[in-house]
From Swiss-Prot:
PROSITE patterns referenced in this protein's UniProt entry, alphabetically: ILVD_EDD_1, ILVD_EDD_2
Keyword match Iron-sulfur: yes
Lineage: Bacteria, Pseudomonadati, Thermodesulfobacteriota, Desulfobacteria, Desulfobacterales
Transmembrane domains' residue ranges: none
Positions contributing to [2Fe-2S] cluster binding: C119, C194
Encoding gene (name): ilvD
UniProt-recorded name of the protein: Dihydroxy-acid dehydratase
Chain positions recorded as Mg(2+) binding sites: D78, D120, K121, E446
Amino acid sequence: MKSDSMKEGLARAPHRSLLKSIGYTDEEIGRPIIGIVNSANEIVPGHADLNKIARAVKDGVYMAGGTPVEFSTIGVCDGIAMNHIGMKYSLGSRELIADSVEIMATAHAFDALVMIPNCDKIVPGMLMAAARLNLPTIFISGGPMLAGRYPGKPEKKVDLITVFEAVGAVKSGRMAPEELAIIEDAACPTCGSCSGMFTANSMNCLTEAIGMGLPGNGTVPAVMSERVRMAKQAGMRILDLLKNGVTPDKIMTAKAFRNALAVDMALGCSTNTVLHLPAIAHEAGVSISLDLINEISGIAPHLCSLSPAGPNHIEDLNMAGGIQAVLKELARKSGLIDPDCLTVTGRTVGENIASARDADGQVIRTLETPHHAQGGLAVLFGNLAPDGCVVKQSAVVDKMLVHEGPARVFDSEEDATTAIMDGRIKKGDVLVIRYEGPKGGPGMREMLTPTSALAGMGLDSTVALITDGRFSGGSRGAAIGHVSPEAMEGGPIAVVKEGDTITIDIPKKKIGLKLDAGEIQNRLSGWNRPAPKITRGYMARYADQVSSANTGAIFKK
């Protein structure tokens, strides 16, 4: 066992003495040492109840003959960090989480790991660490929040995005402040990751699809006892993975990532998956290009219309059979799902889905009756984004799939939000929010406040928003992010001027600035890089090390 290097033999008497000071017995020290990576805290709704999950995991580890040793990681709530300086720190926390798990697991010679994440950057950060460390690892997430119900109208579901969009509705006079207060109180009724197909749930579902979580990991609600039982099963299962030498490199293969991308497209997941899956794959020695994402989107249909794109929530997907049912439906089409990929169950994808439910035709549509023939995400290229940009095409109204309009240019999210709230944005406009990329932000903030304000004001069907920042999984409309190269790196987005004509053609995967190449080059030759917005601390170091969004915003070294 790896832990023998820190606990066995004469020279390790001091180490054993330290373990005994905590209360571990010789019997416990002699067992496999299983690191329990618990990201619980009291500020993130999806992490507020993770101590209960950790206790269940430890029970499972003990039942299977291991010794669980718990340690913590940080975790940021993107919703609470939204639209202020805090959002600059969210994406950067992904790398910090991966590094901290690597440090703890290596320094203490753990034999295997059980990861307990739930929300946006914690899930990919832990997956990156799992791939890097390549110790036997299993994931058990905290589970999704239940959707809220509008008081007096139990058939009307509400969620966090309902609140964000209601702010814009109040500002435009379309909703009374009293109704906003009612929605605010009703939208988030339980702990858990926010209830739609937003970033956290996207990543939890893809963790299951790629094989690193047990069936149900992505969809069983946080408040259900099934989640606790699953945690115990994960604790027991990790000892089997250790015994059989099943490490992440045997699960997170190139074929498994293709499976995850197919599920991504079927679910209509967050655009943030285009950052996270390549970053995780990079740690696993697998390459995921933007062209591959378009390739799979072209053949994997959009089967589930989940909030913010549709009326259903993760609890509905769970009741319809969850990720295993989605995998089973996709597997009916040759080339979409590789059934031979290994999972943490010890069985293959094909063996797991053999007992899964069939698509119900409503929450999970069949291949013959998809919401859209293509997948939920699309990557666009053109002279405005030579290295690509990303849109959740499943959340764009039909008439905005092709659009041309004048650029309304802003150098920060705050300036753009003020313009929207002040009524200065008109139908047909194309908002350009720049210097919000990985380096320029720094940290590539999510533009959920401006997209929600547009939706709340009824402008999401007539106004596009383009940014080198990114979007929450809760954003909808023609919200095009991850423009690469970013403005801070001298990308063409840096020299867009107020009133320039921008063309968008999502079906053709094109985005352009109606200027000839010579004019764009002339403007770029006169461009000067602005001073960094943060000059000390972690995010200053992050801005120096981070790469472009088109490669997953990973560190260069």
